[in-house]
From Swiss-Prot:
HAMAP family (UniProt xref): HisA (MF_01014)
Protein name in UniProt: 1-(5-phosphoribosyl)-5-[(5-phosphoribosylamino)methylideneamino] imidazole-4-carboxamide isomerase
Family: Belongs to the HisA/HisF family.
Lineage: Bacteria, Pseudomonadati, Pseudomonadota, Gammaproteobacteria, Lysobacterales
Catalysed reactions listed for this entry: 1-(5-phospho-beta-D-ribosyl)-5-[(5-phospho-beta-D-ribosylamino)methylideneamino]imidazole-4-carboxamide = 5-[(5-phospho-1-deoxy-D-ribulos-1-ylimino)methylamino]-1-(5-phospho-beta-D-ribosyl)imidazole-4-carboxamide
Amino acid sequence: MSFTVYPALDIRDGRVVRLLQGDYARETRYGDDVLPRAQAFADAGAQWMHLVDLDAAKAGGYTLAALLGQISRQTGLQVQTGGGVRSREDVARILDAGAARVVVGSLAVRDSATVIGWLQEFGTDRLTIALDTRQDAAGVWQLPVHGWTETAEATLDQLATQYAQAGLQHLLCTDIARDGMLSGPNMGLYAHLRALAPQLQVQVSGGARNLADVAAAKAAGCAGIVLGKALLEGHLDLKDALAC
């Protein structure tokens, strides 16, 4: 299995931002130079990037179609993107705009039957399921929903198994406790997922801070790692990460 580094940009109100543990009230802004940053990813040798529409994640209705098209055409990057994907029409529109893969998050937890139907319709390589998880006191990986204020009935293990059996290829999993914290990814979580469903191509997300974290994700047999804050704040050089 090849290993992919996904430099990431989260967009809100046209600006590159990062949220601390997904909290919209704890936002750091990094400027509105989205296209130049994407070009810099390509110039460093990246083949993929991860693009998130934070406005849509909150309100629904993906808003980055025009920007996505620009990035795809001008940089040659393959873009994995999502935020507010709630209908079949959303998926089709984002793919038509130039996405290589569409990320489905909240709906994948709320209505797995519908999303499994999309896998069959659009192809298992065109969707990435994103699951945000938090470990409870009993050690069970739960799936917080509705802005992480409630917990879904299904657990991470149950949904990951269900999607794997339905033919899902790409699973992006974020440990909420590590998101934006630069405290290192929770490699125990990813080892657990790899053992649970070895056929899944698991992407590491949340907490990556240095080359050792990238190397650990690769050594664990994960398919890739999403790098956000560490790149934006200069803790990690993209060329070095790509060469890892």
